[in-house]
Amino acid sequence: MSDIAERVKKIVAEQLGVKDEISNEASFVDDLGADSLDTVELVMALEEEFECEIPDEDAEKITTVQQAIDYIQSHT
């Protein structure tokens, strides 16, 4: 697993309080129980960790762990 993937999963686990193994295919809302506020906070945490800005229109498209990993890899 890449360093980015590990860091993204760590942030997801911390932000959403997930104790179990997080799969790359996991949906923030459907699988991990996030609500709209959780997803906003998650995006803010990713922006801070990776020192990047995720525009709202891009953030709306990031709904799974893998999409977050892919976005960070292509924008950092």
Swiss-Prot record:
Respond yes or no to whether keyword Transferase is given for this record. no
PTM statement from Swiss-Prot or TrEMBL:
4'-phosphopantetheine is transferred from CoA to a specific serine of apo-ACP by AcpS. This modification is essential for activity because fatty acids are bound in thioester linkage to the sulfhydryl of the prosthetic group.
One Gene Ontology term, aspect cellular component: membrane
On whether Ribonucleoprotein is a keyword of this UniProt record, the answer is no
**UniProt-annotated location(s):** Cytoplasm
Report domain Carrier positions. Answer: 2-76
Q: Which residues carry this modification: O-(pantetheine 4'-phosphoryl)serine?
A: S36
- SUPFAM superfamilies membership: ACP-like
Q: What does this protein do?
A: Carrier of the growing fatty acid chain in fatty acid biosynthesis.
What name does UniProt use for this protein? Acyl carrier protein
Give the originating organism: Methylococcus capsulatus (strain ATCC 33009 / NCIMB 11132 / Bath)
The gene name reads acpP
